[in-house]
Amino acid sequence: MPSGFVPRHPSLEDAYALLTFPRAPKTANRLASPPSDVSDASADDPPERPVVIRADGIARKFGNFVAVADTSFEVRRGEIFGLLGPNGAGKTTTFRMLCGLLVPSKGQIEVAGYDLRTAKAGARARIGYVAQKFSLYGKLSVEQNLRYFGRSYGFFGQALQDRIDASLEDFGLTDRRDTTAGSLSFGAKRDLSMACGLIHSPEILFLDEATSGADLASRRAFWRRINALAAAGTSVVVTTHFLEEAEYCDRFLIQDAGKVLALGTPREVKQRAAVLCAVSGQSLVVDRMSIEDAFVAIVEAGRRSQETPS
């Protein structure tokens, strides 16, 4: 078994995928080359990887409403980091602050070595962003969309054309390069949106509900691509409503009511859930626990603690 992988019990979804899906070809993006400071350290030793995102005591208020409260964490080079939580938990607000789309009410965020308070433009040049509602120009062709985003990141001439051609090939869009983005299927729009987000070989990729509306085959293909990007040194921050997809993250954070309830690897989060269940007289076995089981246990324990008088 490759290093960094944690075994888990197969699910019905796994069986369905094995029985019905053909083996996928390579999905690595040729534009995603490892940064020069990436070492050969295995996924078992992430502390040796440099920190690319640092959130230190960040919070966000809207009037008197606290959307995110005193949140701190780090994301390292080549790490897949997930943000999970129920609706209204604060994960989208946290995500938007990391992207520079929202300013924290307090605290500090560093992205790719840049303080977002003072050097937002420098950070944005090093990140890619794929929105849930694809940020494409429907009346422009596939190639024109790629050209627009490539130019916005400072690429021109043959260097830009090489990146466009590589993106078209990597995402299987070569035959549709002259097709307008608005006429593409949902899956092709998602692929084009990903290609636009990666056209400049970003150090960090932000994915907002990227598998929302996708079928199982498309979701599996998406995660194969994300794993290939991470292996090449790209850090990935993802929000998702599919709890089972947290298994594909190196680490993830669970929020509710703006507060961090758990942070760690899938196994560490399950262990946290098992401890919380034991305290309340329930029993969950880590090796038989799904991410959904852990998520429900942690969120329910967090809500009980808020209801208990201090």
Predicted regions and their residues:
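Conserved ABC transporter NBD signature motif
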Residues: 107-115, 122-123
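Conserved ABC ATPase "signature" region
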Residues: 147, 151, 158-176
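Catalytic Walker B motif of ABC-type/P-loop ATPase nucleotide-binding domains
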Residues: 205-209
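ABC ATPase "signature
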Residues: 263-264
